[in-house]
């Protein structure tokens, strides 16, 4: 699967369960660890867990074996390592505190085309 397709699989999985404020960062020129980061918010720890589980399920359904995941039990910040794509699902306060978009400033950013209604 192409990396851009995997990004879209992650975005679709997040949108399926109404993730908020989905942003993709192209970090190919910034780090050798991954090519893209997808960042999204869930409105509760339960939703963060559900969103993360859905991304993992959809990745596996598309033949991608996740390399690892962290934070699924806490529901505050789930990190999913899909290889060329790393997905961060967080509570809004956690996202604001760590401000990954600022940390990776200079990386090309794009928002998901379809944002779920609130």
From Swiss-Prot:
From which domain of life does this come?
Bacteria
Entry keyword annotation includes Repeat: no
Q: Name one GO cellular component term.
A: cytoplasm
Keyword field contains Cytoplasm: yes
One annotated GO molecular function: ribosomal large subunit binding
Instruction: Look up the record and give one Gene Ontology term from the biological process aspect.
Output: cytosolic ribosome assembly
Indicate the family of this protein.
Belongs to the Iojap/RsfS family.
Q: What is this protein called?
A: Ribosomal silencing factor RsfS
**Highest classification ranks of the organism:** Bacteria, Pseudomonadati, Pseudomonadota, Gammaproteobacteria, Pseudomonadales
Encoding gene (name): rsfS
